[in-house]
């Protein structure tokens, strides 16, 4: 069986324009040591904007 390790952490994604935290996802700390930036849909802005990982 696979062993559960602490390589994956849960992060929040916040819109860079309005600052609302819209998405929750997991990331692997080894593969992505820096903050993730993804283009996602923001319901408050009503369009696709860049979402950045928050602490």
UniProtKB/Swiss-Prot annotation:
- Set out the biological process GO terms recorded for this chain's protein: translation
Q: Which SUPFAM superfamilies match?
A: Zn-binding ribosomal proteins
| A single cellular component GO annotation | ribonucleoprotein complex
Identify one Pfam family in the record.
Ribosomal_L33
Enumerate the GO terms in the molecular function aspect.
Answer: structural constituent of ribosome
Q: Which PROSITE patterns match?
A: RIBOSOMAL_L33 (PS00582)
Which of UniProt's keywords are assigned here?
A: Ribonucleoprotein, Ribosomal protein
Keyword flag Ribonucleoprotein: yes
Family statement = Belongs to the bacterial ribosomal protein bL33 family.
PANTHER family registered for this protein in UniProt: 50S RIBOSOMAL PROTEIN L33, CHLOROPLASTIC, LARGE RIBOSOMAL SUBUNIT PROTEIN BL33C
Annotated protein name in UniProt: Large ribosomal subunit protein bL33
**Originating organism:** Dehalococcoides mccartyi (strain ATCC BAA-2266 / KCTC 15142 / 195) (Dehalococcoides ethenogenes (strain 195))
């Amino acid at each position: 069986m696979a062993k559960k390790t602490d390589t994956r952490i849960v992060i929040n994604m916040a819109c860079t324009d309005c600052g609302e935290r819209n998405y929750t996802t997991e990331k692997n700390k080894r593969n992505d040591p820096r903050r993730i930036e993804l283009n996602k849909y923001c319901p408050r802005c009503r369009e696709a904007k860049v979402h950045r990982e928050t602490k």
